[in-house]
Amino acid sequence: MTILRKTHPLMKIVNHAFIDLPAPSNISGWWNFGSLLGLCLIIQIVSGLFLAMHYTPDTLTAFSSVTHICRDVNYGWLIRNMHANGASLFFICLYLHIGRGIYYGSYTYMETWNIGIILLFLVMATAFMGYVLPWGQMSFWGATVITNLLSAIPYIGTDLVEWIWGGFSVDKATLNRFFAFHFILPFIIAAMAMVHLLFLHETGSNNPLGIPSDSDKIPFHPYYTSKDLLGVIIILVLFXSLVLFSPDLLGDPDNYSPANPLNTPPHIKPEWYFLFAYAILRSIPNKLGGVVALVLSILILALFPHIQTANQRSLMFRPISQFLFWLLVSDVLILTWIGGQPVEPPFIIIGQIASILYFLIILALMPIAGLIENKLLKW
């Protein structure tokens, strides 16, 4: 008798994806983040579903409904804190996952990489709309400022912004539609993640050496299921510690004040995971230029497969490119710090230098380093 998991139409799909999948024998802990992102998505969908049962998307009651969840609903404070900090965990795993992809040259799997970029945009859109829902000060002003950026689009900008708002300012219609989109997008993300996996399993996983591993494969289960489980346990311990001990560590105190259109907060800034892009936006004194740079700061990831000049795929044996990679990581951290600072000297010039460096490293220095390393290999 054949094993059921290999013959049953549904179980066969799961089997090929998570059990009998041939995986490279040498992939490291950096390959854990895919499964951890799946875990984050599940945490967010489940906690979000329970929050949606008690939340009201109305400008008059949204803020008090969140307060009601925290005070009156059984374990509501826990669900809310899990959902708010789950977004931070999601982005930590996401950025580490992308960093891994850049370091080990995983971007050469074009379809997987491009679906990943679409996923990044979807997650960012979902997180932004979710931040608006509690209807605190930073929710309202963040929504106003970020949606207003679309008015920089020539000719159709103003109409587009008013169409998104559903009126002439961020109001009840905006909150309502943001709630609707925030609810549906995670399911679209889950579907896209399936496509992401589908394309990945067409080619098989990359590995730290960046060389074909067809001659040395091991089954995914039990080797990588146990390895992923270890990652899950570590992440859940860290996550639970953050949620239970310092749930407001990554949030903005301004969001504990109800939204007031007549009172602008001293520093309008998004959540920490958008600060690097926000810093790039602010470092250009032209509105349209800033918006273009903001979009390009993420879209530039799509160029990686096209600007690789090195003969070796991974950065494991490429010291010059390694240096530039870690310089890029440091640069993104500096941009994140600058994004949270007020617009005044010396932060303005630091942000501008860091923004130029961000694009320079990716578009010029890394391809040049690849060519130099090719020459060094021939010596």
Swiss-Prot record:
<dbReference type="InterPro" id="IPR016174">
    <property type="entry name" value="Di-haem_cyt_TM"/>
</dbReference>
<keyword id="KW-0408">Iron</keyword>
<dbReference type="GO" id="GO:0008121">
    <property type="term" value="F:ubiquinol-cytochrome-c reductase activity"/>
</dbReference>
<keyword id="KW-0472">Membrane</keyword>
<dbReference type="GO" id="GO:0045275">
    <property type="term" value="C:respiratory chain complex III"/>
</dbReference>
<dbReference type="InterPro" id="IPR005798">
    <property type="entry name" value="Cyt_b/b6_C"/>
</dbReference>
<comment type="similarity">
    <text>Belongs to the cytochrome b family.</text>
</comment>
<feature type="transmembrane region" description="Helical">
    <location>
        <begin position="347"/>
        <end position="367"/>
    </location>
</feature>
<dbReference type="InterPro" id="IPR005797">
    <property type="entry name" value="Cyt_b/b6_N"/>
</dbReference>
<feature type="binding site">
    <location>
        <position position="201"/>
    </location>
    <ligand>
        <name>a ubiquinone</name>
    </ligand>
</feature>
<keyword id="KW-0679">Respiratory chain</keyword>
<keyword id="KW-0830">Ubiquinone</keyword>
<feature type="binding site" description="axial binding residue">
    <location>
        <position position="196"/>
    </location>
    <ligand>
        <name>heme b b566</name>
    </ligand>
</feature>
<keyword id="KW-0812">Transmembrane</keyword>
<dbReference type="InterPro" id="IPR030689">
    <property type="entry name" value="Cytochrome_b"/>
</dbReference>
<feature type="transmembrane region" description="Helical">
    <location>
        <begin position="33"/>
        <end position="53"/>
    </location>
</feature>
<dbReference type="InterPro" id="IPR036150">
    <property type="entry name" value="Cyt_b/b6_C_sf"/>
</dbReference>
<feature type="binding site" description="axial binding residue">
    <location>
        <position position="97"/>
    </location>
    <ligand>
        <name>heme b b566</name>
    </ligand>
</feature>
<keyword id="KW-1133">Transmembrane helix</keyword>
<keyword id="KW-0479">Metal-binding</keyword>
<dbReference type="Pfam" id="PF00033">
    <property type="entry name" value="Cytochrome_B"/>
</dbReference>
<keyword id="KW-0999">Mitochondrion inner membrane</keyword>
<feature type="transmembrane region" description="Helical">
    <location>
        <begin position="226"/>
        <end position="246"/>
    </location>
</feature>
<feature type="transmembrane region" description="Helical">
    <location>
        <begin position="77"/>
        <end position="98"/>
    </location>
</feature>
<dbReference type="Pfam" id="PF00032">
    <property type="entry name" value="Cytochrom_B_C"/>
</dbReference>
<dbReference type="GO" id="GO:0005743">
    <property type="term" value="C:mitochondrial inner membrane"/>
</dbReference>
<dbReference type="InterPro" id="IPR048259">
    <property type="entry name" value="Cytochrome_b_N_euk/bac"/>
</dbReference>
<dbReference type="InterPro" id="IPR027387">
    <property type="entry name" value="Cytb/b6-like_sf"/>
</dbReference>
<dbReference type="GO" id="GO:0046872">
    <property type="term" value="F:metal ion binding"/>
</dbReference>
<feature type="transmembrane region" description="Helical">
    <location>
        <begin position="178"/>
        <end position="198"/>
    </location>
</feature>
<dbReference type="InterPro" id="IPR048260">
    <property type="entry name" value="Cytochrome_b_C_euk/bac"/>
</dbReference>
<comment type="subunit">
    <text>The cytochrome bc1 complex contains 11 subunits: 3 respiratory subunits (MT-CYB, CYC1 and UQCRFS1), 2 core proteins (UQCRC1 and UQCRC2) and 6 low-molecular weight proteins (UQCRH/QCR6, UQCRB/QCR7, UQCRQ/QCR8, UQCR10/QCR9, UQCR11/QCR10 and a cleavage product of UQCRFS1). This cytochrome bc1 complex then forms a dimer.</text>
</comment>
<protein>
    <recommendedName>
        <fullName>Cytochrome b</fullName>
    </recommendedName>
</protein>
<feature type="binding site" description="axial binding residue">
    <location>
        <position position="83"/>
    </location>
    <ligand>
        <name>heme b b562</name>
    </ligand>
</feature>
<dbReference type="GO" id="GO:0006122">
    <property type="term" value="P:mitochondrial electron transport, ubiquinol to cytochrome c"/>
</dbReference>
<comment type="function">
    <text>Component of the ubiquinol-cytochrome c reductase complex (complex III or cytochrome b-c1 complex) that is part of the mitochondrial respiratory chain. The b-c1 complex mediates electron transfer from ubiquinol to cytochrome c. Contributes to the generation of a proton gradient across the mitochondrial membrane that is then used for ATP synthesis.</text>
</comment>
<keyword id="KW-0349">Heme</keyword>
<feature type="transmembrane region" description="Helical">
    <location>
        <begin position="320"/>
        <end position="340"/>
    </location>
</feature>
<feature type="binding site" description="axial binding residue">
    <location>
        <position position="182"/>
    </location>
    <ligand>
        <name>heme b b562</name>
    </ligand>
</feature>
<keyword id="KW-0249">Electron transport</keyword>
<keyword id="KW-0496">Mitochondrion</keyword>
<feature type="transmembrane region" description="Helical">
    <location>
        <begin position="113"/>
        <end position="133"/>
    </location>
</feature>
